[in-house]
């Protein structure tokens, strides 16, 4: 049986590839023999015209997972409006709270060897007036995988996010670069700078793909450093 592996995926911003990287991790874990489950506890924006109320990111995670979980477990908080979760929740007259998220994680963990939990937006996105994504990550207490959207400004965003993760006592287990702007000047030099600045393994850089395909992207990501640390922790 594989050693237990769980992680929390966050990013330097919104729309920088967290869902793609989460799906890549699930794909790689399943290939390594794990029963892998994905959670996106909070999703803002429902698919227009879908036969049932759902979210595109949630469906990508469900497709990549090797453990089939009920939708409400994968995403206990689904909001209609594609905006900051605290604003979307206020529009619907609800308040996002932590217990349903922790319950969903516990349920997923009971059925899987590995659970990948994807955050929403960046690391400090508000979830309510007094609760944000960072606090959700702390409550889960998982090692963090950081997705860096490679575009102008990524060095500052990555450094600030890595500092915020460390300041909360969380372990940054690795980071993945995702090319958001293929015309970015000095892209390779920026990646080299990130490798020096971020005190965590660089798991890979995903080039700009024709479409967000987890199997194609998985060829550019190595999860061995994540699994090696898990094995060391169990010794």
From Swiss-Prot:
Pfam families with a match to the protein in the record: AAA_26 (PF13500)
Cofactor: Mg(2+)
CDD domains assigned: DTBS
Positions bound to ATP: 15-20, 57, 118-121, 207-209
Gene Ontology CC annotations of this record: cytosol
Catalytic reactions on record: (7R,8S)-7,8-diammoniononanoate + CO2 + ATP = (4R,5S)-dethiobiotin + ADP + phosphate + 3 H(+)
Keywords: ATP-binding, Biotin biosynthesis, Cytoplasm, Ligase, Magnesium, Metal-binding, Nucleotide-binding
Top-level taxon: Bacteria
GO molecular-function terms, A-Z: ATP binding; dethiobiotin synthase activity; magnesium ion binding
EC number(s) given by UniProt: 6.3.3.3
Localization (cell): Cytoplasm
GO biological process: biotin biosynthetic process
Binding site for Mg(2+): 19, 57, 118
Active-site residues, as the UniProt record annotates them: 40
Top EC class of this enzyme: ligase
Pathway per the UniProt entry: Cofactor biosynthesis; biotin biosynthesis; biotin from 7,8-diaminononanoate: step 1/2
Assembly and binders: Homodimer.
Role this protein plays: Catalyzes a mechanistically unusual reaction, the ATP-dependent insertion of CO2 between the N7 and N8 nitrogen atoms of 7,8-diaminopelargonic acid (DAPA, also called 7,8-diammoniononanoate) to form a ureido ring.
Family: Belongs to the dethiobiotin synthetase family.
Full protein name: ATP-dependent dethiobiotin synthetase BioD
Organism: Ralstonia pickettii (strain 12J)
Record lineage: Bacteria, Pseudomonadati, Pseudomonadota, Betaproteobacteria, Burkholderiales
Name of the coding gene: bioD
């Amino acid at each position: 049986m594989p050693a237990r592996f769980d992680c929390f995926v966050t990013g330097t911003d919104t729309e920088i590839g967290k869902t793609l990287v989460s799906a890549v991790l699930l794909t790689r874990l399943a290939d390594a023999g794990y029963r892998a489950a994905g959670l996106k506890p909070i999703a803002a924006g429902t698919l227009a015209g879908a036969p049932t109320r759902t979210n595109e990111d949630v469906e990508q995670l469900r497709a990549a997972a090797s453990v089939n979980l009920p939708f409400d477990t994968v995403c206990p908080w689904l909001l209609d409006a594609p905006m900051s979760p605290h604003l979307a929740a206020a529009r619907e007259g609800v308040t996002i709270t932590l217990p349903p998220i922790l319950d969903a994680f516990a349920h997923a963990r009971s059925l899987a060897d590995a659970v990948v939990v994807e955050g929403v937006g960046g690391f400090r996105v508000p979830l309510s007036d007094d609760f944000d994504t960072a606090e959700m990550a702390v409550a889960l207490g998982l090692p963090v995988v950081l997705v860096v959207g490679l575009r102008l400004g990524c060095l500052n965003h990555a450094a600030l996010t890595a500092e915020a993760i460390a300041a909360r006592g969380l372990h940054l287990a690795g980071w993945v670069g995702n090319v958001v702007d293929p015309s970015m000047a000095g892209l390779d030099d920026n990646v080299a700078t990130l490798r020096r600045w971020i005190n965590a393994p660089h798991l890979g850089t995903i080039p700009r793909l024709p479409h967000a395909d987890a199997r194609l992207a998985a060829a550019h990501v190595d999860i061995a450093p994540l699994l090696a640390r898990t094995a060391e922790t169990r010794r």
